[in-house]
Amino acid sequence: MTDIEALATDNDISREDIPHLFSKLAIGAYERYMQTGSRDDISKAIDSAKQGIDLANDRNPWLTQWLNNLGVFLETRYERTGEMKDLEEAIKVVRQAVESTPNGHPDLAAMLSNLGNEVETRYERTGEMKDLEEAIQIARRAVESTPNDHPGLATWLNNLGVLLANRYERTEGMRDLEEAIQTARRAIEWTPNDHPDLAARLNNLANMLGRRYERMGEMKDLEDSIETARRAVESTPDHHPNLAAWLSNLGNKLESRSERTREMKDLEEAIQAARRAVEATPDGCPDQAAMSNNLGIKLIRRYERTEEMKDLEEAIETGRRAVDSTPDYHPNLAAWLNNVGRFFERLYEQTGKMRDLGEASAYLLQAWSCLHAVPFHRVTAAAKCLELLAIQNRVDQGINLGRKILDLLPSVHTRTLDRNDQQFVISTFAGVASDLCAFLLSTNRLTEALECLEQGRAIILSQLLDDRSDLSSLRHDHLQLANRYQSLVDEVNAPTRQTTPGVVEALLRKRRQEAAAELDMCLKEIRCVPGHERFMLGQTVTEMQECITEGSIVVINITNFRSDAIIISNNSLRTIVLPELSASKARLWHIVAEVSASKTHPSEGLPRVWWIGSGLASSMLFHAAGVHTRGSTENAYCRLISSYTPSIKELAYAQNQAKRAQEVLMAQDTNTMLIAAMPTSPKGPGDEKAPKELPRVE
C-alpha cells in the first residue's frame, strides 16, 4: 500500500480521490523540477503520475488529462537524459489520451498539439520521414478542431507552419512551402501585438519567405522577408534572450538584398544588425560563435567591394573568435573553420605572403578533420584546400587529401540544400576530381588519375540523375540494402537543430559518428554484392575501354595546376600535356582539338571522338574548335566526328540502353517508323501540303 493509499484509509478519503492526490503530487514535483532542475523531482513526477493513472477507473473523466500530463513529464525527462524509451512512452500515453478524447472536446486540440510536438521530437532524433508526416497530420487536426476564437489557435497554426517548412527542406515540395507561408501568416493574424510569441512567429515567417525567394527569385518575397524580420526585431525588448537571433536573421536578409541590388546601404545595415547581435549575446552563450561568424561573413562582403584592409582584418578576428568559442565536438565548427580559411585566402591575395596561404590551408584542413560535422562542410573545406595545395605545389599531400574526399563523397547528399548550395556542391565535387586528376598526372599515375576522375563524375551524375545512379540499380536488385544505405546517408547529413537540448545533442553527435561507421560498413557490404562491386566508384580503365567500339574518348582536364588531354581507345591509354592551355589562357583551347585529332590515328575515314570536358574545360565546345575562314580545314568539323558524354560510365549506359531497344525491335520482327506531318510550326511558316504528302512518304 502506498503512503497516499494509507493516508486515504486513515482519513476516510474516497478511493476515487486517490488518483487526484497522485496527480497533485506529480504536478508539484514537476513544478519543483522546473525550479531546481533536479532529476529526482522529474522522476518523482513521472512515478506519481503513473501511480495515479494505474488507480484510476477507465471511465474517470480526468484520465485523459492525466495521461497527457504524464506525456509532458516523460518528454521533459527525455530532454534531460536523452533516453529514447522516455520519448517513446510519452508518445504512447499521449496517443492514448487523444484516442480517448471525443471530437469537439475543448482539450482535444491541446492534446493533439502535445502529441504532434513529441512525434516531431522523434523525427528530429531519428530523421524518419514517417514521423514528420504524422506530425503534420496531427498538427493539421489540431488546427481543424480549434474554433477561430480559441486563444490557442495561433500556436497550433504556427506549429503546423513550421512542420510544413521542415518537410519542404526535405522534399523541396513547393506546395508545402506555400502552405507554410499561408499558415504562418494566419498565425500572426491571430496573435495580439503584445503577445510574447509574436516575434518568434514573425521570425519564422521571415525565414519561410526567404526560402521562397531563394527558390523563385521574386524580389517581393525578399522585401517581405526583410520587413517581417524587422518587425520581429522591433517587437523584442532589448534584453530578450532571442533578440540576437532575430537581429542576425535580419542581417542575413539585408545581406541577400545587397547581393541582389548591389546597394551598399543594405550591406551597411546588415553589418550593423550583425554587430548588434554579437553585442546582445552574453559571454559563454552557445550562440556566441554563430553571431561572430555571421559578422565576419558580412565584413568580408564589404571588403570584397571596398578592399578596405580593416574589414578583412576584423573579419579574420571575428572568425577566429567564433572558432575559439566553439568546442571541438560542435557540428558547426567545420563551417566556422572553413570561413576563416577563406578569409586568410583573401589576405594572401592581398599580401602575396606564403605564410597567409599556409594559415588558410591549415584552417581548411582543420575543418576537414571535424568528424562531427555534416559531410557538406567537410568536403567544401577540403576542396578549397586542394586548390591552395596546388598553389604551394604540395602534390603528395594533395593526392592524399583528394583520395579521402572521393571516399567521403558517397556520404554526401544535396536534397536538404537549397538550389544554390546544390549547384555549389556539384561543382565542388567536379573540382575535387579534376584537381586530383591533375595531381596524379603530375606523378605519372595515368590509370589512377583517369579512374579517380571517372569516380568523381559518377557520383555527380548520381546526384543529378537518380534514375541512372548506382543507387537506383541497387534498389532494383536489393531494395532493403539500398534503403539501409539511403537511411544512413540521411542520418549522417541531418543537421542538428540549435534548439535541441544539450544532452540530446550530445547523443545525436554520438549517433552521427556511429552512423558514419555503419555507412562505411554498408558500402563495403554493397561492393561485395555481385554486379555492384564498383558502387559509387566509377569504372576501371579496362571497363572504360570495353565500351569503346569505335574511335576514341578524349578527356580534357584544365585546372590551375596543369592541363592535360587523356586519350582512351579500346586498346590504348595515353596522355598529352597541354602547357599552352592554362586557366589564364583558356581562349587557346582550340589547341586541344588540333593536338587530339593528330594523335587518334584513324584507320580509315574521319575518326570518331567522344569529348569529356573536366575542370575549366567542362563547358568548352570542342566540336567547333579551330580556324573557320573560307576554305580552311584546320578545324574539328573537317577532322573529326565529334560527340559528347558526361562520363564514360554514362556512355556505357547509353550504349546498353540502345542495345536493349534494338533487341526488343528485333524480337518483334516488325519494321516500324513514326512519321509526323507538320502543317504548322510554332516558329516557322509551316507547310500546308504536309498532310497530303504523308501517304506518299508512307
Specify the residue positions occupied by each region the protein language model found.
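Non-transmembrane amphipathic alpha-helical segments
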Residues: I4, A26-A29, A49, G71-L74, ...
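Amphipathic alpha-helical segments of tetratricopeptide repeats
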Residues: E5-T9, D47-D54, R95-E99, R140-E144, ...
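Acidic, Ser/Thr-rich low-complexity linear motifs
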Residues: N11-H20, G37, N57-W66, G82-E83, ...
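Structural register within alpha-helical repeat arrays
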Residues: I18, L25, A29-R32, L63, ...
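Structural motif corresponding to the intra-repeat A-B loop/turn of tetratricopeptide repeats
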Residues: R32, T36-R39, R77, T81-M84, ...
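Amphipathic alpha-helical protein-protein interaction segments
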Residues: L365-W368, E387-P685, K689
